Amino acid sequence: MKWLSKTCIVTLILISCEDAKYSLDNPFDPENIDLRPPALFFHPPNILAGLDTSISVELYGLELEPAAAAHLDIRYDWGSLTVDSVVPGPFFKGQNSPMEIAIDEQGVLDIFIFYLPDPQSDESLAGTWSLATVYLSTISTGESELLYGENTTLVDAKNDSIQIKDFGKGYISVE
């Protein structure tokens, strides 16, 4: 009798359980951004902000090879935005913090990031990581586009260029 009771309980549990159904369509997931890796993109790709506010955008790499340095040539509408600061992301962090130089000139932000070698490595790990975060202030209303310029390059520890197949765009709408 106990055996029959246990069998009925186990049977009820098995037939009443159902696998969870998840909708895996987050537009911010790297698999859903429609870029061929290795790629560079802006996260978030679309920003809605008010006038005279501070915003941030991350410069992301999708399935990047290990790198020792980067020159990120960022184009933006300098009549609508001002660059406040740039902070290196985790892609170039090892035992030492990376060295970063940012030069902002009339809508062209040149960011140079260098991995500082340590006893274990002379370049970053591969993967999908944030290369840097750019902090901006909005100064006029309208639409602004963020682009990676033609001078954007990544190099490995031997100073060989790392191929980037695709570049995403970013959009900032200021109301």
What function would you assign to each model-found segment?
Residues 1-16:
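Sec-dependent bacterial lipoprotein signal peptides
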Residues 17-175:
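Acidic, low-complexity intrinsically disordered segments
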